[in-house]
Amino acid sequence: MAEKKNEQEIQQELQRLIAEINRLQGQMEAINAQIDLIESSISELNRVEETLKGVKELEGDEEVLVPVGAQSFVRACVTDTERVIVGIGAGVAVERTIDEALESIDDQRQELEKARAEAQQKLQELAQELQEKQRKAQELAQQLEGAQRIAQQSGGG
């Protein structure tokens, strides 16, 4: 009877560990998705920075191709190569010099890179915790297998 209780305790602990493993895997997936979004935002900022630097080098009234979506473009003349309209959030936009816009982009990129580093650190911590839980679950599964084998031998003999 004591062997059966031991087997039940092992099963309960194993089920608890499996639930923990599933929770950790879910957290890791969410953090990976967050990192993907951050990296996408960084890439977008890099494209904007490159575009603004290109606009800054234009000499007034030069014709450029402006993307309108679905790999389609319109021809346009840039009349002001010193100022741009920049969104600052909540649907609000302000006029800034290109240099101010570039500085703002750099600040945003630094914030995003910091957030990415923090997310990657958290991901690494969760991966280590997951590995430890998986190791413990493997040990318990082996203990359970051994306990079941002993129970079969003593019950069959």
UniProtKB/Swiss-Prot annotation:
Database matches in Pfam families: Prefoldin
CDD domains: Prefoldin_alpha_GimC
The keyword ATP-binding is assigned to this record: no
SUPFAM superfamilies with a match to the protein in the record: Prefoldin (SSF46579)
GO cellular component, one term: cytoplasm
Keyword Repressor: no
Protein location: Cytoplasm
GO term, biological process aspect, one: protein folding
Top-level taxon in the UniProt lineage: Archaea
Cystine pairs: none
A GO molecular-function descriptor: unfolded protein binding
Keywords: Chaperone, Cytoplasm
Function of the protein: Molecular chaperone capable of stabilizing a range of proteins. Seems to fulfill an ATP-independent, HSP70-like function in archaeal de novo protein folding.
HAMAP family in the cross-refs: PfdA
Family named by the database record: Belongs to the prefoldin subunit alpha family.
Subunit structure: Heterohexamer of two alpha and four beta subunits.
Protein name in the entry: Prefoldin subunit alpha
